[in-house]
Amino acid sequence: MDALLAELDPDIEWRPHLSALGGRSIRGHAEVRDYLASLEEEWEDFRQEVERLFDAGDEVVVFLNTYSRGRASGIELQPRVAHVLRFRDGKCVKCVTYLDRADALRAVGLR
């Protein structure tokens, strides 16, 4: 987790998909750490693979294939999500997650 946090601006704004956290954003390293720790509590074998990147000027769209299994239920999920990332001074300052990849492309004017 420390390697990820090193790539994020200390004041990062991270907006998980709307159904997570009641649609609210999280801010800063401490909240990101808490959010990711809560995912680890609920999900095992969690991993993401980059499928494709799109240059959108000040932003980058990342298509990800995500894999996880519920710790209590054993249910496996494989959502194909997108992140829209904004960078400043080499650090990610904003991350917005989309469950619909077309929505991510529309958000940056690529569709």
Regions found by a protein language model. Give the residues of each.
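C-terminal and inter-domain tail/linker signature
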Residues: M1-R111
